[in-house]
A protein has these predicted regions:
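Active-site-adjacent beta-strand anchor residues
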Residues: 16
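Residue-level signal for threonine
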Residues: 19
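Short, residue-level hotspots on alpha-helical faces of the histone-fold
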Residues: 51-55, 59, 96
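Charged interaction scaffolds used for protein-protein
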Residues: 1-13, 28-47, 63-113
């Protein structure tokens, strides 16, 4: 497993990961689908932004075998403490992870548009 990207949030340096488990959970929480992932930065509600960061942190911890016993409210409080710059950091990691999709996955995703 390659080393996961980490962000400083909640008083710690925490791993972030946006694999299919994280994206599946986020789609379920947000009510959005895979076809919406390409436009995620446009008109993203505040609650969806918080849940995206939450899912990335939760699954980064899972992949790193680190306990993650935090809620979305905890993550929202951390964002309050760190500022919205943390959202930009997470979006960069998210964008990088989407760039790692295979050509077949990209083609399938583009057909859904």
């Amino acid at each position: 497993m390659s080393e996961l990207k980490k962000i400083a949030i909640g008083g710690e340096l925490r791993p972030v990961h946006f694999g299919f488990a994280a994206l599946s959970q986020w789609c379920e929480l947000s009510g959005l689908g895979l076809q919406d992932l390409g436009n995620i930065g446009e008109n993203l509600s505040l609650s969806n932004a918080i849940s995206l960061i939450y899912c990335g942190l939760k699954h980064g911890s899972r992949k790193s075998k680190i306990d993650f016993n935090h809620t979305m409210d905890d993550v929202a409080d951390w964002i309050d403490d760190e500022g919205m710059g943390i959202f930009n950091e997470v979006m960069e990691i998210f964008t990088e992870s989407m760039g790692k999709m295979s050509p077949a996955e990209k083609k399938k995703k583009n057909k859904g548009k």
